[in-house]
Amino acid sequence: DRGVCYCHHCGYKLYVPDDSEERERQQRKENYNRARKLPSHFRRPVFDPKRTTLSEKLEQYWTQERCLAQRLLADLRITEERVRLPESSKEENCLCFNYFEGGTLINTKYRSGRKHFMMVKGAELIPYNIDAVLDTPECIITEGEFDAAAFMTVGRKDVISVPAGAQSNLNWMDRFVESHF
């Protein structure tokens, strides 16, 4: 028995794990919860829900220029903030991609209209939208947050983006292999 159920009417397939697989899944969740404890050397930003009120300009950029679903601004808890960015040494208005794990804000990526970027100094690098792949049989891994949002716009929920863009160093993935993949 493979644990696969099949509906001959609609073609829907469903996998039902056996007891040992269920125990393994529970163990992975427990390991995941233990791993979520903040190591002493990491900083965490504080999420301010007041910043989820976005400017009309940012909303137009998101929906009209990027052609992304309006609902994702709230679903992904996108915020907007004026931040001093190192590339320009000036304060710039930024779209903020907030990196959550288990409902806790872990990091924030600030992106200005001039394509200047910054992440919270000393914060842990984790994949963007990591909780979306918890207990899913497959996922899509993209290079950037906008790419992930594009997949979500067309209906995929199991999408993450690598931290800090495309690179050959995949060490960030090690912590999530047992708990998320």
Language model regions located:
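The −1 position to Zn-ligating cysteines in a subset of zinc-ribbon hairpins
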Residues: 6
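Short metal-coordination and nucleic-acid-contact micro-motifs, chiefly zinc-binding Cys/His arrays
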Residues: 3
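Short Cys/His-rich metal-coordination motifs, predominantly Zn2+-binding knuckles/fingers
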Residues: 10
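Cys/His-rich microdomains that often coordinate metals
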Residues: 14
